[in-house]
C-alpha cells in the first residue's frame, strides 16, 4: 500500500489452542515466534491470546483440566504470555519505531515457519534485533541481559 499503513497483529495463534485431532496444541514457542516475526517485519504492535483466557473458565466450570483446557488463573501465567511480555520490554528499551525489516543481516538460511530467522535494524544502523531459537542448554557460560 502507498502510503504505508501501520498494522497490528491482533489475532495470532492462541496459546493452548488445539491444532487438530491427535496434534499438539499451540505452545509458547509458536506464540513467541509469531510475536517476533510480526514485530521484526514492521508491525506497530502484537496482541497475545490464550484460548483458556478467551473461555474464561472459573471454579464452577471445573474440574480442570477440562477437555484439555485450564482455569483462567492458570492460563494467565502461561509461558507464552511471559515471553511476549519479555519481548515488549526488549522493544521498549530501544527506539523500535525507528526499525526497518532487514533480512540481509542474516548470514544463514532464513528457514520457514517457527524456524524462520527474522531481523530488523535501526534506520541509522545503531542496533539490530534478530529472532532465532537457541538451545541454551548446549551453550556453556550462558548469561542473560536484564530486560
Q: Could you tell me what each predicted segment is?
A:
Residues 1-31:
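Active-site clefts of carbohydrate-active enzymes
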Residues 7, 15-17, 31-147:
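Aromatic- and carboxylate-lined catalytic core of secreted/periplasmic carbohydrate-active enzymes
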Amino acid at each position: 500500500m502507498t502510503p504505508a499503513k501501520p498494522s497490528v497483529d491482533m489475532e495470532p495463534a492462541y496459546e493452548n489452542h488445539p491444532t487438530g485431532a491427535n496434534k499438539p496444541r499451540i505452545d509458547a514457542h509458536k506464540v513467541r515466534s509469531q510475536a517476533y516475526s510480526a514485530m521484526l517485519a514492521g508491525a506497530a504492535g502484537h496482541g497475545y491470546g490464550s484460548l483458556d483466557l478467551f473461555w474464561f473458565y472459573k471454579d464452577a466450570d471445573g474440574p480442570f483440566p477440562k477437555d484439555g483446557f485450564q482455569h483462567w488463573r492458570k492460563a494467565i501465567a502461561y509461558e507464552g504470555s511471559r515471553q511476549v511480555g519479555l519481548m515488549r520490554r526488549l522493544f521498549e528499551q530501544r527506539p523500535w519505531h525507528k526499525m526497518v525489516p532487514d533480512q540481509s543481516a542474516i548470514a544463514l538460511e532464513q528457514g520457514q515457519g517457527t524456524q524462520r530467522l527474522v531481523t530488523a535494524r535501526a534506520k541509522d544502523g545503531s542496533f539490530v534485533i534478530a529472532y532465532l531459537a537457541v538451545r541454551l542448554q548446549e551453550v556453556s557460560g550462558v548469561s542473560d541481559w536484564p530486560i
